[in-house]
Structure formats: C-alpha cells, structure tokens
C-alpha cells in the first residue's frame, strides 16, 4: 500500500528510546530533506491499520543507486512484521527500476535495527559521525550566500562524497549557501538565523582540517553541525581536537543486489 507519508507520520514513528520524544521534522525541514535528497514520496512503501498509517519507508533513487532515507514504524505496532514487509517491498521496488546498490545509515544506539538490516544482506561500509559545536561569541565576517551547480561543487570537492546527503547534487539542491575555501580544505555552509549546518566539507590532511575549522569560527558564529563525517577522516580528528562534540555515531550500510 502506498501513499505520501508526512512529517507528522515520521515524527510519530521515530519516538522512543533511540530517537527521543520530540519532533525531528517541521513541515519546512521535512520538505527540504525530501527535495534535497530526491526522496520519492509517491513511491514510498507504507502500511496502514484502518485509516491510520502505521509504517513508512521512503527512498531516493539516483541512477542505479538507492538510498533508504526514512524508515519508521508506529511504536504501538512494532514487532508485528511491519518493517520486514516494507523492506521486502522497497527492495523489490528499487530492484525493478534497475537499482543495484542500496545505502542507508543506522544509529549505533539502535542494535535491533542493525541486526534487522543485516538480515536483508546489508553490510557495514564505514562509521559516520554527527558533530556539533556551540555558537561562537565575538565579531565575525559573514560569508556571502550563493548558488553553485552540481558540477562546480564536484570540482571543488574532488573526492567521492561521504554519503548520499553530502553528494554534490544534495548540496546544490540546498539552493543558497556559503562556500568556504582554505588550502587543502573546503566547506559548504547553510545558515538559518541562530543555526548553521555544514552541507559538505573535506580536508586533505590534519593541517588543512584545522585551518578549515579556524575559518569556520571566524565566519560562522551560529550553532553549527556537520553530519555524517567518516570517523577516520582528518576532519573528524580535527573536530575532536577542537572540542566539537559527537551528537551521533552511525553505521553506513550498503546492500548489493
């Protein structure tokens, strides 16, 4: 059964011991997440009980790759086989479209979901960290916001993206953001009032990573996050040294069809 799952649906699905008891999406942030990551809500796999949606799996497709970006089941209907049925249907759906490679991320605090994904043939490819720092006081020089095309972003990054959400296409679809560049490192940053998010960043070594973080402090005073940075990268090591905190640790999972 398919229908368009909403922000309210996923906010309800994600409540519990792993995700907490607060809404993870607003209507605007949900729409932005869906658009930037090519999530096809019309193709989402859902399950209902009566008139109520009790589970949904929404995915994006880029060529022969798919990303299972949103998977959730109503807490009242867990352990009823809902997630298993949706996963079966979603894998079959993307396979029918020629997809040969599926990606997803799983919180390391969510051991049952890790075992669940492994049961479908997903294997761990890496470890991704969600980093954050508090707002910085003092005078800063704001960076100009601009638009860049996907090809220009790829030319700046010059390396495979850490994950689906940080691919050049996802960054370009953010529409307006700042580009920060230092020798050997770069960052694309989107700001919104008192909060900022690094859409993507990279550094070739420890020195360039440290220089990039100093530049971020000079130009981005807001609370700042960087999602899904590989745990073993020069940037992750520099973030730890600079006092950023780890908000989440995730397993990066892949499945080849």
Go through each PLM region and give its residues.
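Conserved beta-strand in the GNAT
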Residues: 46, 52-60, 67-72, 183-191, ...
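Active-site rim helix/loop that mediates acceptor-substrate recognition in acyltransferases
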Residues: 11, 15-58, 157-179
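Charged, low-complexity intrinsically disordered regulatory/assembly segments
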Residues: 179-257
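Conserved active-site alpha-helix within GNAT-family acetyltransferase domains
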Residues: 80, 84, 108-126, 230-248
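Amide-forming acyltransferase catalytic core, primarily the GNAT-like/NAT-type
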Residues: 6-10, 25-27, 99, 118-193
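Conserved catalytic-core motifs of GNAT/GCN5-like acyltransferases
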Residues: 103-107, 123-136, 245-256
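Conserved acetyl-CoA-binding loop-helix of GNAT-fold acetyltransferases
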Residues: 73, 79-92, 96, 115-119, ...
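Conserved GNAT acetyl-CoA-binding A-motif
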Residues: 94-106, 128, 220-230
């Amino acid at each position: 059964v398919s229908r368009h799952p909403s922000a309210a649906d996923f906010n309800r699905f994600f409540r519990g011991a792993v995700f907490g008891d607060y809404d993870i999406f607003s209507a605007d942030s949900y729409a932005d997440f869906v658009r930037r990551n090519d999530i096809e809500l019309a193709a989402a796999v859902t399950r209902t009980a009566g008139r109520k949606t009790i589970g949904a799996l929404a995915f994006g497709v880029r060529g022969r790759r798919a990303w299972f970006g949103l998977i959730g089941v109503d807490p009242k209907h867990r352990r009823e086989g809902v997630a298993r049925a949706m996963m079966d249907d979603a894998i079959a759906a993307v396979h029918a479209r020629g997809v040969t490679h599926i990606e997803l991320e799983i919180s390391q605090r969510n051991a049952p979901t890790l075992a669940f994904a492994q049961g479908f043939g997903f294997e761990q490819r890496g470890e991704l960290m969600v980093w954050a720092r508090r707002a910085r006081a003092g005078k800063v020089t704001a960076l100009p916001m601009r638009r860049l095309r996907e090809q220009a972003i790829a030319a700046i990054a010059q390396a495979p993206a850490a994950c689906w959400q940080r691919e050049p296409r996802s960054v370009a679809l953010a529409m307006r953001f700042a580009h920060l560049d230092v020798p050997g490192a770069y960052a694309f940053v989107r700001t919104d009032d008192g909060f900022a998010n690094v859409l993507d960043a990279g550094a070739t070594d420890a020195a360039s990573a440290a220089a990039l973080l100093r530049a971020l402090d000079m130009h981005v005073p807001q609370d700042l996050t960087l999602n899904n940075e590989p745990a073993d990268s020069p940037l992750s090591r520099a973030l730890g040294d600079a006092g950023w905190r780890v908000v989440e640790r995730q397993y990066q999972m892949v499945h080849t069809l």
